[in-house]
Each structure stands twice: as C-alpha cells, then as structure tokens.
Amino acid sequence: MFHRLWTLIRKELQSLLREPQTRAILILPVLIQVILFPFAATLEVTNATIAIYDEDNGEHSVELTQRFARASAFTHVLLLKSPQEIRPTIDTQKALLLVRFPADFSRKLDTFQTAPLQLILDGRNSNSAQIAANYLQQIVKNYQQELLEGKPKPNNSELVVRNWYNPNLDYKWFVVPSLIAMITTIGVMIVTSLSVAREREQGTLDQLLVSPLTTWQIFIGKAVPALIVATFQATIVLAIGIWAYQIPFAGSLALFYFTMVIYGLSLVGFGLLISSLCSTQQQAFIGVFVFMMPAILLSGYVSPVENMPVWLQNLTWINPIRHFTDITKQIYLKDASLDIVWNSLWPLLVITATTGSAAYAMFRRKVM
C-alpha cells in the first residue's frame, strides 16, 4: 500500500519538476517576491516632499523647518512665499503635506503661550499623509520637550517607549514573516489545483483511475507534493529573511514546520476542490486567483483585521491565510509556544477538516 502511494507521489513530483520552465516557476517568483516586497510593499513614508509657508520667520519656526528637512521621511522641502501658493501646491501634488507657521508663532513660544500650527494634508493619499503627519507631530513634540527643559513642569512623569519584538520598527520585520504565508499559499494552490486538470488534459487520468490505487491514495498522492513544494518555498523565504535581511528567528523550527504542514493541508483542500470542479488548467488557474485575491485582502496583510467592519472580521475566520500569518509572526518574532499560537491553530484545524472532507467528497464524485 505504501509502496503504491510512494510511487504516485514520486510520479507527481517527476511530472511537476520534469520541465525546466516549471522548476523556474516554483523558484524564481519566490526569489523575486522576497527581494522586492520588503522594499516595495511598505507603509513607511520615505522620499516625500513637504511644503513650508512661514509667516513668522522667527527662531522657533526656522528651527522646526530645519528639523523637518532633516527627517528621513522628507527628501524635498518647498518654501512657499505667499498664501496663494498653498492650494496649487497641494492640488498639483507637489507636496504630500504643508505646514503653515502663523506670524506670532515664535513670540508665543517665547512667552510660554499656546502656539498653533496649521497642517494641511493631501487627502488623495490619506494613508501616507497621515503617517507623515505623525512624524511631524513627533518632531514638534520633541522640540516642545526641549523648550520645557529647566522650566517648571506640570508633573514629573515621563513616557518611555520600548518596542518589543521589532526594536527599530523596521517594516521588513513585518513583511518577511507575512511573505512566508503569501508565497506558500500560491505554491500550494497552483500545484494542487492544476494537478487533476493536467491529468485530464494529458489523458492520463483514466490510466490513474484503473490503477490499483484507491481514492484516498490518489487524494493523498496529489496532496503530498504540494506540501513538499510549500515547505521548500517557506524554507527559502525563511533563509533569506534570516541571513539576507538579518531578521532573527526567535522561535522553534519544529513548531514552525508543524504549523506549516497544518496550513498546507488546509490549502490542499481548497486546491483539490478547485481542481475537481475545473476541466482545464486554464479554468483551475482562474479559480486560484478568484480565491487568492479576497483571501489576501482579508488576511490582515494589506490592512489590520481590527480595522475592518465587524461582519467582515467574522468572515476572516474562514480564511486560512489570516491564521497562518498570525502564527508565523508570533513564532518568528516572539518565540511563541504552542499554547500561545493555539488560538490561531485550532481554526486552521477546523478549516483543514472541513475543506479536506469537502474536497475528498467532490474528488470522489467528480473524478472517480
């Protein structure tokens, strides 16, 4: 029995890796994505342009302008000469945001009065503008604290911020663990969804059906190669993250690969379900992308799940990518134990049992 199963698994791997183009498809996209995504898919604001309209030209407004210019988020500073330039600057997207110093700004600061600043953001790029505004607020806050040194303070408390699990708040530390889930999802879904459709197109499905193999053996034989491919791709991303991006892996490799197998099995159910419903590889390929786009959007990678409407948050519970993304980040960055990741692991087990049973039933009805 196991010899037959191993023969089928080996046959699936050989048919998958026979052509150089197929091997390249399984490796090159992984390398390209893990190199490009940490730099391109980031919410950090860099190389932005800030506009300054200074009606004060006093000591404090000039000092703050210089500090804004030295910030790493802003590489260009536009100094406006009249209020008439404000609207065209924002309308033509010459600047992401604009700071306006009133005429009495420095005088009020020297007399310890409240000195307001006007900050105008480009709402067409609301996310980046809001992040840049937070940078400016931090700069202003730090300058305010410097002015208060040696002066009577309302209290003696001080807020000390420590960033756990990502000390430098490097966005790559968020992207790379999430990429493990994204890339392995694509690998598993493509391998499993195209497997049965490829057999139909090549005319080898009938030969497989008349073989001594049982239904569950064929089912497992189609699933195991996808798990092997997913594990291999995850290992590539993990190695690049550790040695190329210097992101330390804090957790247990055994726990990581255990949850990786559970996650792969949950995706195998989706993939074989798509493969059983499709007659051609083209249909299966389209089915994969119909699944992938909503799954990625609802995974918490693009935007936090907590920011979604409640009904959409409830819908994300059936999305395996959401749970494995949480598991990967907790194991990778936090050295989480099985007790901690269990809250995300048990939904994966439920999804695995549900999709696996549905795919097996559909596989028997449509294929056998």
From Swiss-Prot:
Residues 46-173, 244-253, 306-339 are periplasmic. Belongs to the ABC-2 integral membrane protein family. The chain crosses the membrane at residues 25-45, 174-194, 223-243, 254-274, 285-305, 340-360. The keyword Membrane applies. The gene is ybhR. It comes from Escherichia coli (strain K12). Part of the ABC transporter complex YbhFSR that could be involved in efflux of cefoperazone. Probably involved in the translocation of the substrate across the membrane. The lineage of its organism: Bacteria, Pseudomonadati, Pseudomonadota, Gammaproteobacteria, Enterobacterales. GO terms for molecular function: ABC-type transporter activity; efflux transmembrane transporter activity. It is a multi-pass membrane protein. Induction: Repressed by the transcriptional regulator CecR. It holds the Pfam family ABC2_membrane_3. Signal peptide: none annotated. Residues 129-366 form the ABC transmembrane type-2 domain. The complex is probably composed of two ATP-binding proteins (YbhF) and two transmembrane proteins (YbhR and YbhS). Residues 1-24, 195-222, 275-284, 361-368 are cytoplasmic. Disulfide bonds: none annotated. This is Probable multidrug ABC transporter permease YbhR. One of its GO terms (cellular component) is ATP-binding cassette (ABC) transporter complex, substrate-binding subunit-containing. Keywords: Cell inner membrane, Cell membrane, Membrane, Transmembrane, Transmembrane helix, Transport. GO terms for biological process: DNA damage response; lithium ion transmembrane transport; sodium ion transmembrane transport; tetracycline transmembrane transport; xenobiotic detoxification by transmembrane export across the plasma membrane; xenobiotic transmembrane transport. InterPro entries: ABC-2_transporter_component (IPR051449), ABC2_TM (IPR013525), ABC2_TM_bact-type (IPR047817), ABC_2_transport (IPR000412). It is found in: Cell inner membrane.
